[in-house]
Amino acid sequence: MKKNIAAFLASGAWIGISEFARNEILFKSYWIDKYAGLGLVFPSDNVNNAMWGAWSFMLAGLVVFLVRRLGLLEAVAAAWLAAFVMMWIVIWNLNVLPTGLLLFAVPLSVLEVALAALISRKIIEA
Protein backbone atom coordinates (compact mmCIF):
# COMPACT_ATOMS: atom_id res chain seq x y z
CA MET A 1 0.00 0.00 0.00
CA LYS A 2 2.83 2.41 0.86
CA LYS A 3 4.43 1.77 -2.53
CA ASN A 4 1.16 2.54 -4.30
CA ILE A 5 0.84 5.82 -2.42
CA ALA A 6 4.46 6.73 -3.11
CA ALA A 7 4.00 5.90 -6.81
CA PHE A 8 0.81 7.99 -6.90
CA LEU A 9 2.47 10.99 -5.25
CA ALA A 10 5.66 10.82 -7.32
CA SER A 11 3.93 10.35 -10.66
CA GLY A 12 1.33 13.00 -9.76
CA ALA A 13 4.10 15.47 -8.96
CA TRP A 14 5.81 14.67 -12.27
CA ILE A 15 2.58 15.08 -14.26
CA GLY A 16 1.82 18.38 -12.50
CA ILE A 17 5.30 19.74 -13.25
CA SER A 18 5.10 18.59 -16.86
CA GLU A 19 1.66 20.11 -17.38
CA PHE A 20 2.71 23.40 -15.79
CA ALA A 21 5.85 23.62 -17.91
CA ARG A 22 4.00 22.83 -21.12
CA ASN A 23 0.89 24.95 -20.64
CA GLU A 24 2.14 27.87 -18.55
CA ILE A 25 5.72 28.28 -19.76
CA LEU A 26 5.94 26.90 -23.30
CA PHE A 27 2.49 27.36 -24.81
CA LYS A 28 0.43 29.80 -22.75
CA SER A 29 0.52 32.42 -25.51
CA TYR A 30 -1.09 29.91 -27.92
CA TRP A 31 -3.93 29.33 -25.47
CA ILE A 32 -4.39 33.06 -24.82
CA ASP A 33 -4.46 33.82 -28.55
CA LYS A 34 -6.93 31.01 -29.28
CA TYR A 35 -9.31 32.19 -26.57
CA ALA A 36 -8.91 35.86 -27.60
CA GLY A 37 -9.80 34.89 -31.17
CA LEU A 38 -13.05 33.50 -29.80
CA GLY A 39 -13.73 36.67 -27.79
CA LEU A 40 -12.92 34.87 -24.53
CA VAL A 41 -10.35 35.24 -21.78
CA PHE A 42 -8.16 32.21 -21.15
CA PRO A 43 -9.12 30.83 -17.71
CA SER A 44 -6.04 30.81 -15.49
CA ASP A 45 -7.35 31.81 -12.06
CA ASN A 46 -6.28 29.92 -8.95
CA VAL A 47 -9.35 27.68 -9.13
CA ASN A 48 -8.41 26.68 -12.70
CA ASN A 49 -4.87 25.89 -11.61
CA ALA A 50 -6.20 23.84 -8.68
CA MET A 51 -8.38 21.84 -11.08
CA TRP A 52 -5.34 21.10 -13.26
CA GLY A 53 -3.56 19.91 -10.12
CA ALA A 54 -6.50 17.62 -9.35
CA TRP A 55 -6.48 16.39 -12.97
CA SER A 56 -2.76 15.61 -12.69
CA PHE A 57 -3.32 13.42 -9.65
CA MET A 58 -6.35 11.73 -11.22
CA LEU A 59 -4.16 10.81 -14.17
CA ALA A 60 -1.48 9.61 -11.74
CA GLY A 61 -4.04 7.38 -10.04
CA LEU A 62 -5.02 5.92 -13.39
CA VAL A 63 -1.37 5.34 -14.31
CA VAL A 64 -0.64 3.54 -11.03
CA PHE A 65 -3.78 1.41 -11.43
CA LEU A 66 -2.88 0.44 -15.00
CA VAL A 67 0.83 -0.17 -14.31
CA ARG A 68 -0.14 -2.71 -11.64
CA ARG A 69 -2.37 -4.61 -14.07
CA LEU A 70 -0.89 -4.22 -17.55
CA GLY A 71 2.45 -4.22 -19.26
CA LEU A 72 4.23 -0.89 -19.37
CA LEU A 73 3.42 -0.08 -23.01
CA GLU A 74 -0.22 -1.08 -22.60
CA ALA A 75 -0.52 1.05 -19.46
CA VAL A 76 1.01 4.06 -21.21
CA ALA A 77 -1.26 3.66 -24.25
CA ALA A 78 -4.42 3.22 -22.19
CA ALA A 79 -3.66 6.14 -19.85
CA TRP A 80 -2.65 8.44 -22.71
CA LEU A 81 -5.79 7.64 -24.72
CA ALA A 82 -8.03 8.03 -21.69
CA ALA A 83 -6.52 11.32 -20.53
CA PHE A 84 -5.24 13.21 -23.52
CA VAL A 85 -7.00 11.98 -26.63
CA MET A 86 -10.43 12.21 -25.02
CA MET A 87 -9.63 15.67 -23.61
CA TRP A 88 -8.46 16.91 -27.02
CA ILE A 89 -11.60 15.56 -28.70
CA VAL A 90 -13.78 17.41 -26.19
CA ILE A 91 -11.95 20.74 -26.39
CA TRP A 92 -11.73 20.46 -30.20
CA ASN A 93 -15.48 19.89 -30.26
CA LEU A 94 -15.90 23.03 -28.12
CA ASN A 95 -13.66 24.91 -30.61
CA VAL A 96 -11.10 25.87 -27.97
CA LEU A 97 -8.27 23.52 -29.02
CA PRO A 98 -5.40 25.34 -30.72
CA THR A 99 -4.81 22.48 -33.17
CA GLY A 100 -1.34 23.74 -34.08
CA LEU A 101 -0.21 22.75 -30.59
CA LEU A 102 -0.86 19.07 -31.28
CA LEU A 103 2.43 18.84 -33.19
CA PHE A 104 4.16 19.47 -29.86
CA ALA A 105 1.51 18.28 -27.42
CA VAL A 106 1.26 14.73 -28.75
CA PRO A 107 4.91 13.72 -28.24
CA LEU A 108 5.24 15.70 -25.01
CA SER A 109 2.10 14.14 -23.54
CA VAL A 110 3.20 10.62 -24.52
CA LEU A 111 6.54 11.34 -22.83
CA GLU A 112 4.72 12.67 -19.77
CA VAL A 113 2.60 9.54 -19.38
CA ALA A 114 5.51 7.21 -20.18
CA LEU A 115 7.71 8.79 -17.51
CA ALA A 116 4.84 8.69 -15.01
CA ALA A 117 4.41 4.98 -15.76
CA LEU A 118 8.15 4.35 -15.41
CA ILE A 119 8.26 6.24 -12.12
CA SER A 120 5.28 4.26 -10.85
CA ARG A 121 6.68 0.92 -11.99
CA LYS A 122 10.09 1.57 -10.40
CA ILE A 123 8.54 2.55 -7.07
CA ILE A 124 6.07 -0.34 -7.01
CA GLU A 125 8.74 -2.90 -7.90
CA ALA A 126 11.38 -1.52 -5.49
Per-region residue spans from a language model:
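Juxtamembrane/disordered regions of integral membrane proteins
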Residues: 1-126
